[in-house]
């Protein structure tokens, strides 16, 4: 029965492909998880920098309220 050998070979090939796909999915999952952690860190850093910028801008006197130095 040559057909049985062919079927067995096809099943083996599918099992190998499935194994490689599982490995690829796990690698991609790890990559996406690491990227989300990095995105979360960067988002927090941007929020902190934005707050610092707002504080710095509010502490600077506006030029309309100051007299020029030659007065």
Swiss-Prot record:
Pfam families: SlyX (PF04102). Gene3D superfamilies: 1.20.5.300. Belongs to the SlyX family. InterPro entries: SlyX. Disulfide bonds: none annotated. This is Protein SlyX homolog. It comes from Rhodopseudomonas palustris (strain BisB5). PANTHER family: PROTEIN SLYX (PTHR36508:SF1).
């Amino acid at each position: 029965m040559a057909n049985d050998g062919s079927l067995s070979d096809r099943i083996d090939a599918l099992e190998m492909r499935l194994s490689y796909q599982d490995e690829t999915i796990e690698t991609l999952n790890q990559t996406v998880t690491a990227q989300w952690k990095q995105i979360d860190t960067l988002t927090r850093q941007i929020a902190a920098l934005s707050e610092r910028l707002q504080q710095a801008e509010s502490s600077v006197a506006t030029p309309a309220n100051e007299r020029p130095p030659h007065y």
